């Protein structure tokens, strides 16, 4: 199947996806909002008054869920190198996660406070070459973890997307060194054919 045909096939399936249709009706920016809702319903990640950092936030589905969960009194800082339209209760900072200036901008926005939750739904551009895609996904997740360590308070929570494969062992090992508990989550809203899972790490610095 040619790339053009694969794209058309994916678009047809995407439009028919019940989570895509439901997200449009509910006003969510993306179907990914339901993944976070389902993880939070199971694990109770959020609470009113928390400070949340959302890495790779655009178009904003996860930030929408977090903003609703931490109100009243909470903060959601959404970060992405892509532009994102404003959302109620969400502060957006545009920049590259690997840039020192970007990290300084976030710390300034936090004003000396620490984040209660850092979450990342970032994924690389998929090439279709399994090993290469897994390696890029791992690199993104490790960057997100390194960044989280600079802003998380204790006992903080880190939620990150990963892709199943041998390389994931390195990420799990790093998380287990830094957090008290690490769990795998595959929310119902994740597509069946997708190799994505989420790693939920709790108890940072405990």
Model segments located where?
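Class I SAM-dependent methyltransferase Rossmann-like catalytic core
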Residues: 1-48
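Conserved class I S-adenosyl-L-methionine
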Residues: 48-58
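Conserved SAM-binding loop of SAM-dependent methyltransferases across substrates and taxa
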Residues: 59-72
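A short glycine-rich, Lys/Arg-flanked "PGG" loop and its adjoining helix->strand segment in the class I
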Residues: 67, 138-154
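Short glycine-dipeptide loop
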Residues: 72-74, 151-157
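S-adenosyl-L-methionine
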Residues: 79-127
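Glycine/threonine-rich flexible loop motifs
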Residues: 126-137
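Class I S-adenosyl-L-methionine
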Residues: 165-206
